[in-house]
């Protein structure tokens, strides 16, 4: 019989009462048991409360990946407050803009005084001795989390979850095993890794974290901790796949039952490679936003029957494809993806710093373009703002990037549109490679995958990865930087 829903804070304590020594979190050479997580979060909660944090508040958490990050989140929930994670490496200007927008009661991860009179505690903070670890009154956070926008727009935006922080600690979700071990190698300030790590911990499992993703290191952690569930973005899957075959073969990853790919559409060739390697029953993909309006999921088995798809809507969530006039697109025609949660518009989130894009009858869009097949499977094209119109033809950068990354020497890439006096826009590819590759070699490779008008007119080499740790591209920032330096292409 399922347990009644309990608050996240109570779930941490309930699990600690049953198996106190069982590991809840592993990071690098450190670990944290259920009992340690419970006691530490009780002390932190009291220290945070002494600095003004209370039920209903937002608390900004700007800590790097690690045990301290999750302990801080648990402490915030035990106060009935809402964690609002941000990157610990954000430039000061960007971080200040987010803090101003969130107006948190407390900032965790910065030195006191960093934001004037706003209370804050630094990384490595130790609660004062008077703050004990005895149990706290049970309080439910009315908002489970407040995630910062992924950054693709370049403007700070908070997505406040309207669902309260409650769970059943005897129910695992997303195909996880109850009490299993999950690898969450991405940055915890992004929704996917954050939700994944906590789904695991709050259902009695062990979350294995990484400071920064490393392909060989990820395989070593899967073997060492007998990981059965892992969350990867396509960039991580690409880096693992690009390891020498003999390197991949050194690691025993037979305990891995599910790989969930999310964050960006996985290139078809890469998805097929992983299916061939581990089997279709283990390779899954999910699509959705932090807004949780709707989402899709697809197994490897279904993907083989619908290659390139990101799946069908989950639960009672709905989606439709609309053209620019707001009319429903025929099957197979690209349009904007609109979604509706079971509770209707406004039932899952609210924005701080932005407005939802919605139809008059409440269907919302995150700005993605895609199409549906006759079985209701969704296929993504790209983001609407990233589409490039070349001589009147629509080109989706993600398609060109997937073709470029199919070259074994291409580590990462980004394709953007730049002004062109003849075609209106031209395609420009920014490429990080493992070895020297001429423009002609790249064009020859692309001719095997794309029609001529989708092949970039110009190429640029860079030595640093173009995607962040969560696999996100800021195409708008890349485009803006090149516009300043190049301007329109002369005729």
Indicate where each model-derived feature is located:
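Conserved ATP/PPi-binding loop(s) of AMP-dependent carboxylate-activating enzymes
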Residues: 313-316, 327-359, 393-395, 437
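Conserved pre-ATP/AMP-binding loop-to-beta segment of ANL
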Residues: 3-5, 20-21, 125-126, 130-148, ...
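Conserved AMP-binding A3 loop
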Residues: 33-35, 141-167
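Conserved beta-loop-beta connector loops within the AMP-binding
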Residues: 318-338, 371-375, 435-439, 473-474
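AMP-binding/adenylate-forming catalytic core of the ANL superfamily
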Residues: 46, 230, 367-454, 466, ...
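Gly/Ser/Thr-rich phosphate-binding loop
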Residues: 202, 228-229, 245-306, 318
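Conserved AMP-binding/adenylate-forming core of the ANL superfamily
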Residues: 21-52, 60-66, 91, 95-96
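Conserved AMP-binding/adenylation subdomain of ANL enzymes
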Residues: 167-181, 189-229, 243
């Amino acid at each position: 019989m399922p347990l009644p829903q309990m608050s996240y804070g109570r779930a941490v304590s309930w699990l600690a009462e049953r198996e106190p020594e069982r590991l809840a979190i592993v990071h690098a050479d450190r670990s944290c048991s259920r009992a340690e997580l419970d006691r530490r979060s009780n002390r932190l909660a009291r220290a945070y409360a002494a600095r003004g944090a209370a039920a209903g508040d937002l608390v900004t958490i700007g800590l790097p990946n690690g045990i301290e990050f999750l302990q801080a989140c648990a402490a915030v929930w035990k106060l009935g407050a809402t964690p609002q994670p941000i990157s610990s490496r954000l430039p000061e200007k960007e971080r200040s803009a987010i803090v101003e927008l969130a107006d948190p009661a407390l900032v965790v991860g910065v030195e006191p005084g960093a934001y004037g009179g706003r209370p804050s505690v630094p990384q490595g903070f130790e609660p004062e001795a008077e703050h004990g670890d005895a149990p706290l009154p049970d309080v439910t956070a009315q908002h489970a989390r407040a995630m910062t926008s992924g950054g693709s727009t370049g403007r700070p935006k908070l997505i406040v979850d309207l669902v309260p922080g409650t769970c059943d600690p005897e129910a695992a979700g997303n195909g996880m095993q109850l009490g299993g071990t999950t690898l969450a190698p991405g940055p915890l300030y992004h929704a996917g890794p954050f939700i994944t790590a906590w789904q695991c911990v709050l259902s009695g499992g062990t979350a294995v974290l990484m400071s920064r993703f490393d392909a060989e290191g990820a395989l070593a952690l899967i073997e060492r901790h007998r990981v059965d569930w892992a969350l990867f973005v396509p960039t991580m899957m690409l880096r693992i796949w690009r390891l020498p075959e003999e390197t991949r073969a050194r690691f025993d990853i037979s305990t891995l039952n599910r790989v969930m790919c999310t964050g960006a559409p996985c290139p078809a060739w890469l998805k097929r490679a992983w299916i061939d390697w581990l089997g279709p029953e283990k390779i899954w993909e999910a699509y959705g936003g932090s807004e949780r309006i709707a989402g899709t999921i697809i197994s490897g088995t279904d993907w083989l029957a619908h290659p390139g798809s990101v799946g069908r809507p989950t639960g009672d969530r709905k989606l439709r494809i609309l053209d620019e006039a707001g009319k429903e697109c025929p099957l197979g025609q690209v349009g904007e993806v609109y979604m509706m949660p079971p509770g209707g518009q406004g039932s899952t989130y609210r924005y701080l710093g932005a407005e939802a894009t919605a139809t008059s009858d409440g269907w919302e869009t995150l700005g993605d373009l895609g199409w549906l097949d006759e079985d209701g499977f969704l296929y993504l094209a790209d983001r609407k703002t990233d589409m490039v119109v070349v001589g009147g033809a629509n080109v989706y950068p993600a398609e060109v990037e997937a073709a470029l990354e199919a070259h074994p020497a291409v580590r990462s890439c980004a394709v953007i549109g730049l002004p062109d006096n003849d075609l209106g826009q031209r395609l420009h590819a920014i490429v990080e490679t493992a070895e020297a590759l001429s423009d002609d070699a790249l064009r020859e490779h692309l001719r095997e995958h794309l029609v001529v008008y989708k092949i970039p007119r110009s190429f640029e080499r860079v030595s640093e990865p173009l995607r962040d740790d969560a696999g996100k591209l800021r195409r708008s920032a890349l485009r803006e930087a090149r516009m300043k330096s190049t301007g329109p292409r002369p005729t």
